[in-house]
Amino acid sequence: MAERSQTAPEAGNDTGNEDAIGGNVNKYIVLPNGYSGQPKKGHLTFDACFESGNLGRVEQVSDFEYDLFIRPDTCNPRFRVWFNFTVENVKELQRVIFNIVNFSKTKSLYRDGMAPMVKSTSRPKWQRLPPKNVYYYRCPDHRKNYVMSFAFCFDREDDIYQFAYCYPYTYTRFQHYLDSLQKKNMDYFFREQLGQSVQQRQLDLLTITSPENLREGSEKKVIFITGRVHPGETPSSFVCQGIIDFLVSQHPIARVLREHLVFKIAPMLNPDGVYLGNYRCSLMGFDLNRHWLDPSPWAHPTLHGVKQLIIKMYNDPKTSLEFYIDIHAHSTMMNGFMYGNIFEDEERFQRQSIFPKLLCQNAEDFSYTSTSFNRDAVKAGTGRRFLGGLLDHSSYCYTLEVSFYSYIIGGTTAAVPYTEEAYMKLGRNVARTFLDYYRLNSLVEKIAVPMPRLRSKEERRLGWEHPSCLRAEQPLEVLGIPMCSGKALNEHLGNDIQWHLDCGSSTLPLGLISCSPSSSASWNDMAMSNSILLPDHSFH
């Protein structure tokens, strides 16, 4: 049994002594000062000793307020963003305030309405806390660093509640997902182990294509996709799963893509960091996305393996490595968007804008306005920058970013929070966009059957989305309270804050609006422009 910790050195947002946080809390029981008996209901028990868990320390401020300290990434105290922990031994209708006090970033989507995720044992579907109960502010009690506080009311004594920065996606979940695909024995889906992490976790490489494209001597057009190099960026895995789900489906577009293209996907480049609950780094404290120039086989083995494979394909005269897309999540911006490279060749520079513009037309949550092309020095060593300099003029390298929080549909100002399904839908739209890019539309068989209003779960997950089939969480009816500081939270807590997990799974259909490119030059404009030529992607 562990008693409440004594005051320890505080951590600033950019620097700070994190020596007091050596690991995750393990069934940590918070007892009142001077209490020596057995724990009672309401003496909260915190735990983060599970896969992808993160909570380093808990300090009780008052009877109902707790300061929570994120455990820094292993071997690197600079990064403290991801949290994922459970709370149990609660009392019915017990109200609390949790303060996350040691974020390493000052800018955050919490300023724009983002809220932590929550679920419980009796309600296992993740939900966002109501934004009215979440506050992001400078706190004088913590060196004027930014603190995120949220108010919560526990409603079931027997439940274990779990809170997280965003939807978790663990290494084990990923392995189960790939195992389920492998059991289907699809002749166009190939899974191999490209290498192992420092802690001997598997680095999976997926190949999705028609078997004819893998015959020795055949020419190949390769699309290479990677994800989860930053372990706390969990939306990356949902987007990647959406790409995979669509490509292995029987959708006519997926069949055409498999016949003409070879998709190589390494969905989890940092399995150790994912398992440990790090935000940005590997087990040894390295930001792998800054080590593409010279990855070490012992310190960065997963990155080393992927780089060696890409170089091997680049040197193969029968292989045309046409795209490299690295999937990330962004903690301060809305929507999906891309980063691309700057080239001296003006025509090549213009050509690389084609794919993002097509994706904007296919995905309502993708913003071409937020897409940028740069040669930023701080991005040196990233996959996009390194491979953009290595590969020839026919190859394009992008970083695909997606918001941790929400997207804004064109023509509106309302933020639509992302769900797991919405992230996967973006992945499906990324895959579908290759059909437009390679001008393979005429090969897709026309289906004249009307789209039904209600379809099976599998069809909703893999198929084209009809407006009535796009679904989102029903807004929860909650009572909010105003505040600007931790002390104000205490004053306003009272009886007005009561938020309980939604007992049902009701959903509200939303209309689907076609996305138009945000820039002045649409795909059709570009096609008719004298300053840019449509890419010639002939298949012989």
Swiss-Prot record:
Gene3D superfamilies in alphabetical order: 2.60.40.3120, Zn peptidases (3.40.630.10)
Single GO term (MF): metallocarboxypeptidase activity
Cofactor details (free text): Binds 1 zinc ion per subunit.
Active site residues per record: 401 (proton donor/acceptor)
Disruption phenotype: Mice are more vulnerable to DNA virus infection due to impaired immune response. Knockout mice promote somatic cell reprogramming and higher litter size at birth. Knockout blastocytes show enhanced development.
Keyword Metal-binding: yes
Residues involved in Zn(2+) binding: 230, 233, 328
EC assignment: 3.4.17.-, 3.4.17.24
Domain Peptidase M14: 167-438
Pfam family, one: Pepdidase_M14_N
InterPro entries attached to this UniProt entry: Cytosolic_carboxypeptidase, Pepdidase_M14_N, Peptidase_M14
SMART domains with a match to the protein in the record: Zn_pept
Compartments it resides in: Cytoplasm, Cytosol; Cytoplasm, Cytoskeleton, Microtubule organizing center, Centrosome, Centriole; Golgi apparatus; Cytoplasm, Cytoskeleton, Cilium basal body
GO terms (BP aspect): anterograde axonal transport of mitochondrion; axonal transport; C-terminal protein deglutamylation; central nervous system neuron development; defense response to virus; negative regulation of cell population proliferation; positive regulation of ubiquitin-dependent protein catabolic process; protein deglutamylation
GO cellular component: a single term: Golgi apparatus
SUPFAM superfamilies named in the record: Zn-dependent exopeptidases
Reaction equation(s) it catalyzes: (L-glutamyl)(n+1)-gamma-L-glutamyl-L-glutamyl-[protein] + H2O = (L-glutamyl)(n)-gamma-L-glutamyl-L-glutamyl-[protein] + L-glutamate; C-terminal L-alpha-aminoacyl-L-glutamyl-L-glutamyl-[tubulin] + H2O = C-terminal L-alpha-aminoacyl-L-glutamyl-[tubulin] + L-glutamate
Keywords: Carboxypeptidase, Cell projection, Cytoplasm, Cytoskeleton, Golgi apparatus, Hydrolase, Metal-binding, Metalloprotease, Protease, Zinc
Reported cofactor(s): Zn(2+)
Tissue note: Widely expressed. Expressed abundantly in testis, pituitary and brain and to a lower extent in eye, stomach, adrenal and kidney. In brain, expressed at low level in cerebellum as compared to cortex.
Family affiliation: Belongs to the peptidase M14 family.
Functional note: Metallocarboxypeptidase that mediates protein deglutamylation of tubulin and non-tubulin target proteins. Catalyzes the removal of polyglutamate side chains present on the gamma-carboxyl group of glutamate residues within the C-terminal tail of tubulin protein. Specifically cleaves tubulin long-side-chains, while it is not able to remove the branching point glutamate. Also catalyzes the removal of polyglutamate residues from the carboxy-terminus of non-tubulin proteins such as MYLK.
Oligomeric form and interacting partners: Interacts with MYLK.
PANTHER family, alphabetized: CYTOSOLIC CARBOXYPEPTIDASE, CYTOSOLIC CARBOXYPEPTIDASE 6
Name assigned to this protein: Cytosolic carboxypeptidase 6
Species lineage: Eukaryota, Metazoa, Chordata, Craniata, Vertebrata
Gene, per the UniProt record: Agbl4
